[in-house]
């Protein structure tokens, strides 16, 4: 695999203006496929969820999945699109082994949703409006697995296996209009846009939205034009990018590659590209086809979809609060700073914090536990924080043990470890591990006497007015009591013992 020459991103931005475009494919989580009764289930044995309609057997007829149509309308509404009162399916004709019918049932000039927009908030709060050209319904293709090659791609493979379980799974393809004016923030905008689409479809409940499973896939189009020129440049399309980080890096790389090609005096080739995460680069795929090459024509086996205004309004009434509006509401209610709230969102614990507050914790307590303890443990385990098994009720119970003085913060982290290890509830773990705070002054005074005797110089400093030196004595007591002393009470007793006012 050869990697093309690139210009530095900064040099590219000095000379050229990037124009972006995205086609995001969203797999719908319906029980059955788009046009057949075959199950829509991820991860089953290859070629077990497939029937005659999916394979295009002679004499079989497709039937439109009503739930898929409703999900498509919901997506269109969430993207501020107009919903077509009348739309049709079309056949997109091409031959490839993962398309057993030799055509894909899609929509061409009559999509179900069109002319929308989505406001994207970047990390610094800048809002960038992305205009949506269309959102149309179609079916997914099967999945090819290339065997024998080093990179799992068709190049160099000995043979390929095809799994038709995915063939016919409902898709909504969301196509943007050309995105101009992003400048050096184009890669950041690309990532934020796909993240917003993923968040919206997950919030709607119409897709599992797991990019690692291919539920959300992005084709990223990039072209460059010299500053001041109106006409668009030749674009490339990086296909099936399946992570947010990869979308950002792929757009950045293509900008740098295009700039190097243009600087060399060579023409940019209109083509598809493949993204390689290991080298963070793209390689050439095939010449990019135009719509005419697919010979679209209306699907003769399916009747048009008529979305009455009453039906559309019924679906609109079921839409949940938009994610952006919800974030704004929660930020104001919780009183977090911009940075604090951004960290919460980026860590993926906003829902968990909301549930913890609803369970009885304060906003600050919920953030302290989720951001201060649980997110870090999730990173170490390389899982999502929600997958650790810590419930809002656990956080509330754990924090109450601290507030009631039964355990201190250090013990609380040990209790949390016990919860993660499946040892029981916080109260049960405190009892099993013997983690109660030492509240009897007798043992504390004994430990204080020992600590003062071991550090007489520190004791003299405290008597002399250097009260900040008390930390060393407190530390000695905490060590002697295996962290089970109340540090605040220990400090009070030390000052009383030395006759010093704190």
Curated annotation (Swiss-Prot):
EC number: 6.3.5.-
Catalytic activity: L-glutamyl-tRNA(Gln) + L-glutamine + ATP + H2O = L-glutaminyl-tRNA(Gln) + L-glutamate + ADP + phosphate + H(+); L-aspartyl-tRNA(Asn) + L-glutamine + ATP + H2O = L-asparaginyl-tRNA(Asn) + L-glutamate + ADP + phosphate + 2 H(+)
Disordered as annotated region, ranges: 272-293
Molecular function as annotated in GO: asparaginyl-tRNA synthase (glutamine-hydrolyzing) activity; ATP binding; glutaminyl-tRNA synthase (glutamine-hydrolyzing) activity
A UniProt-annotated Pfam family: GatB_N
Keywords: ATP-binding, Ligase, Nucleotide-binding, Protein biosynthesis
Enzyme class: ligase
BP GO annotations: glutaminyl-tRNAGln biosynthesis via transamidation; translation
Coiled coil start-end: none
Job description of the protein: Allows the formation of correctly charged Asn-tRNA(Asn) or Gln-tRNA(Gln) through the transamidation of misacylated Asp-tRNA(Asn) or Glu-tRNA(Gln) in organisms which lack either or both of asparaginyl-tRNA or glutaminyl-tRNA synthetases. The reaction takes place in the presence of glutamine and ATP through an activated phospho-Asp-tRNA(Asn) or phospho-Glu-tRNA(Gln).
UniProt subunit comment: Heterotrimer of A, B and C subunits.
Family: Belongs to the GatB/GatE family. GatB subfamily.
Protein name listed in UniProt: Aspartyl/glutamyl-tRNA(Asn/Gln) amidotransferase subunit B
Organism name: Paenarthrobacter aurescens (strain TC1)
Designated gene of the protein: gatB
């Amino acid at each position: 695999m050869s990697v093309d020459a690139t210009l530095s991103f900064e040099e590219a931005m000095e000379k050229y203006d990037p124009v972006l475009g995205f086609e995001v494919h969203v797999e719908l989580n319906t029980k059955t496929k788009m046009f057949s009764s075959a199950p829509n289930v991820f991860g089953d044995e290859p070629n077990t969820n497939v029937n005659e309609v999916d394979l295009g057997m002679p004499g079989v007829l497709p039937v439109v999945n009503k739930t898929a149509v409703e999900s498509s309308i919901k997506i269109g509404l969430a993207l501020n699109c107009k919903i077509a009162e009348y739309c049709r399916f079309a056949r997109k004709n091409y031959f490839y082994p993962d398309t057993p019918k030799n055509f894909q049932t899609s929509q061409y000039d009559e999509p179900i949703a069109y002319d929308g927009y989505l406001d994207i908030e970047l990390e610094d709060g800048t809002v960038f409006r992305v205009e949506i050209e269309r959102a149309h319904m179609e079916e997914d293709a099967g999945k090819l697995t290339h065997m024998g090659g080093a990179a799992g791609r068709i190049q160099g493979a000995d043979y390929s296996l095809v799994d038709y379980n995915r063939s016919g799974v409902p898709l909504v393809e969301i196509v943007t209009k050309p995105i101009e004016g992003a400048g050096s923030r184009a890669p950041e905008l690309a990532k934020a846009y796909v993240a917003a689409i993923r968040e919206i479809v997950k919030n709607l409940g119409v897709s599992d939205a797991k990019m690692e499973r291919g539920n959300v896939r992005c084709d990223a189009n990039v072209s460059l034009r010299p500053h001041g020129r109106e006409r668009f440049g030749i674009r490339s399309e990086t296909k099936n990018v399946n992570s947010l980080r990869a979308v950002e890096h792929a757009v950045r790389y293509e900008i740098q590659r295009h700039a190097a090609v243009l600087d060399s005096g060579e023409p940019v080739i209109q083509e598809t590209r493949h993204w390689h995460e290991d080298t963070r680069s793209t390689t050439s795929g095939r010449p990019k086809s135009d719509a005419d090459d697919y010979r679209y024509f209306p699907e003769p086996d399916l009747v048009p979809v008529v979305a009455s205004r009453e039906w559309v309004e019924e679906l609109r009434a079921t839409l949940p609060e938009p994610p952006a509006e919800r974030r704004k509401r929660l930020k104001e209610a919780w009183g977090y700073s911009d940075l604090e709230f951004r960290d919460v969102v980026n860590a993926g614990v906003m829902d968990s914090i909301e549930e913890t507050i609803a369970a009885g914790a304060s906003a600050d307590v919920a953030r302290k536990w989720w951001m201060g303890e649980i997110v870090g443990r999730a990173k170490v385990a390389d899982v999502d924080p929600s997958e650790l098994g810590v419930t809002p009720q656990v956080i509330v119970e754990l924090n109450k043990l601290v507030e009631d003085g039964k355990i201190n913060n250090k013990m609380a982290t040990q209790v949390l470890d016990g919860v993660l290890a499946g040892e029981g509830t916080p109260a049960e773990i405190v009892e099993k591990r013997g983690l109660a705070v030492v509240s009897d002054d007798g043992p504390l005074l004994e430990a204080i006497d020992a600590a003062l005797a071991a550090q007489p110089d520190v004791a003299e400093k405290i008597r002399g007015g250097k009260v900040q030196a008390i930390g060393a004595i407190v530390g000695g007591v905490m060590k002697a009591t295996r962290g089970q002393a109340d540090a605040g009470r220990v400090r009070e007793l030390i000052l009383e013992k030395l006759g010093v006012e704190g």
